[in-house]
């Protein structure tokens, strides 16, 4: 089946731009499908291949939910309709969106629903700030429009031309499936201070598995769990769960409250650990909340400051993680590296704190309801000790090879 590059925007304000980008892409020999997402009902011909009324019809409550007369409600409703519309399409080679704040909020939820690997480019006036809410756990590329998307001029023509040709290039040079794609994929979480562990595990398992390493920056855990939820992972070695620290204690690399939920939903084979639970991440010292002024800090670099978690915070984290693990009915092993949770959390290192470590271990043991499938396992090593990496590998192989009950 032929595939097309979908181009979406609100033609009542960006019709010129839509036509311009479509013509540029078609000039490369590729085909386009233009989509109008205007939220004001109109009798005019938008010039798009798919009119706004057609997209609005995909809303569960029908077109009237979109064409309601309230701009905010209309944008939210059209976002739902467009998401459902795009999910229904089987001929999508790429999706290019153009918009301001409203258009970006309208288009990116649909982009998030498309499979990873399908090119997604959002040209937006919002792309110079925090775009995490627009991207989520997807592989959306954001391009700052520089000027508002309000007509063609010497700047917008250059920016939109770049966008058109970037998407066309991504489609033209799409990577063919390689032999490694035949291997089952594993998700692994890593931080700089747990790198030796994850590298050792990946090296050992790479002959049998395609090892996908996710940087545990908040979005990394979300991306990994999205793949697990989509059935694209054969197992998870979630050895770096540091995102929980930031969620609970105001850090800047926080996961969401849904962390671990995909593991519970999918019953995917899971080996977890305490990687970097000794630290909360902040930006430069000037950005640290005043309530933490008297805490122990480590300057990772000019833009990253790490705060040591306390005994009480370790109790809270262990309880939170333990309650999440109790919801998991698949094969689960949570490994405790008694010699420390990171490169900084080891005897003689800046974050070594036996009381905090003991508090975490004790609370996790008290919280987790252990069964034949759900176990907490202790090892007398630091997380970066090669023997701990080997233990993680052995636990993973054991649960993968266990007969299902």
Swiss-Prot record:
<dbReference type="InterPro" id="IPR044122">
    <property type="entry name" value="UPF0261_N"/>
</dbReference>
<protein>
    <recommendedName>
        <fullName>UPF0261 protein YPO3839/y0391/YP_3209</fullName>
    </recommendedName>
</protein>
<comment type="similarity">
    <text>Belongs to the UPF0261 family.</text>
</comment>
<dbReference type="Pfam" id="PF06792">
    <property type="entry name" value="UPF0261"/>
</dbReference>
<dbReference type="InterPro" id="IPR056778">
    <property type="entry name" value="UPF0261_C"/>
</dbReference>
<dbReference type="Pfam" id="PF23189">
    <property type="entry name" value="UPF0261_C"/>
</dbReference>
<dbReference type="InterPro" id="IPR051353">
    <property type="entry name" value="Tobamovirus_resist_UPF0261"/>
</dbReference>
<dbReference type="InterPro" id="IPR008322">
    <property type="entry name" value="UPF0261"/>
</dbReference>
């Amino acid at each position: 089946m032929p595939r097309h590059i979908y181009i979406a925007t609100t033609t009542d304000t960006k019709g010129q731009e839509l036509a311009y980008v479509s013509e540029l892409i078609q000039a490369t020999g590729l085909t386009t499908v233009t989509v109008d997402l205007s939220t004001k009902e109109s009798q005019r011909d938008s010039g798009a291949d798919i009119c706004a009324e057609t997209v609005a019809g995909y809303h569960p409550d029908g077109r009237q939910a979109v064409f309601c007369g309230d701009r905010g409600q209309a944008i939210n409703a059209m976002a739902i309709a467009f998401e459902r519309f795009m999910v229904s399409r089987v001929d999508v080679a790429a999706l290019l969106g153009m918009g301001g704040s409203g258009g970006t909020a309208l288009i990116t939820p649909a982009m998030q629903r498309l499979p990873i690997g399908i090119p997604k480019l959002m040209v937006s006036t919002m792309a110079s700030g925090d775009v995490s809410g627009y991207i989520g756990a997807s592989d959306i590329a954001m391009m700052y429009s520089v000027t508002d998307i309000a007509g063609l001029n010497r700047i917008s023509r250059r920016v939109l031309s770049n966008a058109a040709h970037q998407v066309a290039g991504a489609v033209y040079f799409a990577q063919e499936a390689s032999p490694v794609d035949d291997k089952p994929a594993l998700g692994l979480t890593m931080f700089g201070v747990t790198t030796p562990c994850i590298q050792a595990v990946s090296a050992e398992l790479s002959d049998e598995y395609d090892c996908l390493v996710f940087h545990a920056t908040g979005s990394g855990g979300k991306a990994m769990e999205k793949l697990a939820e989509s059935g694209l992972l054969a197992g998870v070695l979630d050895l770096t769960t540091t995102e929980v620290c930031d969620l609970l204690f105001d850090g800047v690399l926080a996961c969401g409250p849904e962390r671990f939920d995909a593991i519970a939903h999918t019953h995917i084979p899971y080996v977890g650990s305490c990687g970097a639970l000794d630290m909360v991440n902040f930006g430069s010292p000037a950005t640290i909340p005043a309530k933490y002024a008297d805490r122990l800090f480590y300057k990772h670099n000019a833009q990253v400051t790490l705060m040591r978690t306390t005994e009480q915070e370790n109790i809270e984290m262990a309880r939170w993680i333990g309650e999440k693990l109790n919801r998991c009915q698949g094969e689960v092993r949570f490994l405790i590296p008694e010699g420390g949770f990171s490169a900084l959390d080891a005897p003689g290192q800046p974050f070594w704190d036996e009381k905090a470590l003991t508090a975490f271990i004790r609370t996790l043991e008290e919280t987790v309801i252990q069964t034949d499938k759900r176990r907490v396992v202790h090892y007398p090593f630091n997380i970066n000790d090669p023997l701990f990496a080997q233990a993680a590998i052995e636990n993973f192989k054991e649960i993968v090879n266990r007969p299902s009950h």
